[in-house]
Design a protein with these regions (language model features):
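Short loop segments and helix-boundary regions at transmembrane helix junctions
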Residues: 28-111, 207-219, 236-239, 263-264
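Cytosolic-side transmembrane-helix boundaries in multi-pass membrane proteins
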Residues: 241-248, 252-279
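Transmembrane alpha-helical segments in multi-pass inner-membrane proteins
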Residues: 194-245
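Hydrophobic alpha-helical transmembrane segments
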Residues: 13-18, 61-66, 91-92, 131-136, ...
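Transmembrane helix-bundle core of multi-pass membrane transporters
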Residues: 6-11, 82, 90-150
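Alpha-helical transmembrane segments in multi-pass membrane proteins
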Residues: 15-24, 45, 49, 53, ...
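Membrane-interfacial amphipathic/re-entrant helices at transmembrane-helix boundaries
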Residues: 1-21
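Helix-loop-helix "hairpin" substructures at the membrane interface of multi-pass membrane proteins
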Residues: 130-202
Length: 279
């Protein structure tokens, strides 16, 4: 394809590949640990950091990452207290980030051309610095999961049991909250704040239809995410529509197709089982 000759499209493919690895690993923990709502709260809270970055003239991604990590820590700390419900803590930081972001953007003079890309994403605008961020974060995440897979997996499935085994549950939860926040912010250029949480959940949901094994879910999520990105990028180029939204739409279609296939498999299996029992 002629489109592959362009540097911006090559960057988009590389960015999609790195993001698929990153979201495949972190997203599996999110889905297994049932942290989708918390991750959604952190995603929207990161807008506060973007607003502060735009207002102060600093790097919006760096500001968003710091704000997202602090928000994640805040949710984790407040939800561990008996006098605050987890969903209430999430809602508070969710709205805090959005309100701070809106106020800062309103107070910033002049036109802000990068703001729509943070809200809705544009993978075709990924630059070298974005690829470096994704690459470094991907390497860090792979290293963390390579050396600490067993305790992370234990906390993901049953934190109470992990605590009874004298594992550092609190430290692991804060470590994972940091990686979740950094992954969300690093993915903003891909699909934006509005759709970022989808990259961390939909491929994992699709993988979970066919396996419950943690490692298999990670690898399947990476492959599915990469396929979704390639198809979405090509479709957005052909149809001349936003790439981020197209990638998410494709991932949802893949999930629905997989769900249908799985349902048909179960139906055929039950039918064959019933016929064998009659014999």
């Amino acid at each position: 394809m002629n489109i592959l000759q362009y540097t911006f499209f090559q960057n988009a493919l590389l960015g999609a590949f790195l993001t698929s690895i990153l979201c495949g690993i972190i997203g599996t923990y999110i889905v297994t640990r049932r942290l989708v709502f918390i991750s959604g709260g952190i995603t929207h809270a990161s807008f506060g950091g973007i607003g502060i970055g735009v207002f102060t003239g600093t790097n919006p991604i760096l500001a968003a990452m710091i704000f997202a990590i602090l928000s994640g820590f805040g949710v984790q700390w407040m939800s561990s207290r008996k006098d605050v419900r987890k969903d209430s803590a999430i809602a508070m930081f969710w709205t805090l980030g959005m309100s701070v972001g809106i106020i800062c953007c309103f107070l910033t003079p002049g036109f802000m051309p990068d703001l729509p890309s943070f809200l809705f994403g544009s993978i075709l605008t990924i630059e070298g610095s974005d690829l470096w961020l994704l690459g470094i974060l991907t390497c860090i995440t792979i290293a963390v999961f390579t050396f600490f897979l067993h305790p992370i997996q234990s906390v993901a499935f049953d934190s109470t049991f992990a605590r009874s085994q004298h594992l550092p549950v609190a430290a692991i939860e804060y470590l994972m909250m940091t990686l979740i926040a950094m992954t969300i912010v690093a993915s903003l250029k891909m699909v934006g704040i509005v759709l970022a949480i989808s990259l961390l959940t939909i491929p994992q949901m699709t993988a979970n239809l066919f396996t419950y094994n943690y490692k298999q879910m990670i690898f399947a999520s990476i492959i599915l995410g990469w396929i979704d990105c390639i198809i979405g990028l090509y479709a957005s180029y052909v149809l001349n529509v936003p790439s981020g939204a197209t990638i998410i739409f494709v991932s949802i279609m893949v999930f629905m197709l997989s769900k249908t296939i799985k349902a048909l498999q179960n139906k055929l299996y039950n039918k064959d089982k019933l016929s064998l029992e009659k014999k």
